[in-house]
Amino acid sequence: KKPAWSHSSLKDFEGCQRRYHEVKVLKKYPFQETEATRYGNQVHKAIEDYIRDKTPIPPEYTQFLPVVDAMLSKSGRVLAEYEMALTVDLQPTGWKSPDVWVRGIADILIVNDENLTAWVGDWKTGNNKYPDREQLKLMALMVFAHFPHIRKVNAALLFVMFVVIRDMAFFALKRKKADERM
């Protein structure tokens, strides 16, 4: 059985195939959390709790509220840390199903069933100098597969460290174009 992939695992593989093999396949080296990854995980958790459970954002992260609240102002069902998985035939499947081919987690997903539009966002605490829009395309395609009634997906990398709108990498995909790609 081939392991399922994700955008982040693909980026790791593209960065250094040997390192990927040593770390992910052979599991020779355990993951070493850095200050940056620890901070990013703490911010993600605080935002997830704020969205899912209405837990107040800790004081050290309140500067991120304008970006988070801008997303929450969109109409529709709000889903935090929404797990999506597809088979090799691009059909939705369970996260841990034996037939899973690709996985992705939407940090925030807003599905508007009335206007058939969705917003998918990924919180970023790092540098916004080289945004990776390929992640947005993958997430948009996964949303289309999981929500077949949706006609348009707006996707964004949300750089919470930079609260001006120009620091949002944005991508929109309509159902017709998505069907051509799948």
Task: Enumerate the predicted regions with their spans.
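Nuclease catalytic cores
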Residues: 2-56, 81-82
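Generic recognition of stable, solvent-exposed alpha-helical segments in well-folded globular domains
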Residues: 5, 38, 42, 131-134, ...
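Short small-residue beta-strand/loop micro-motif enriched in glycine and branched aliphatics
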Residues: 30, 118-122, 166-167
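Active-site oxyanion-binding pockets that recognize sulfate/phosphate
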Residues: 33, 126-129, 172-175
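Conserved catalytic core of nucleotide polymerization and phosphodiester-bond processing enzymes
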Residues: 33, 37, 115, 140, ...
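Intrinsic-disorder-associated interaction segments
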Residues: 36, 40, 57-61, 175-178, ...
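Catalytic cores of nuclease domains that cleave nucleic-acid phosphodiester backbones
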Residues: 45-135, 146-160
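Substrate-binding beta-hairpin/strand module that engages nucleic acids
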Residues: 143-181
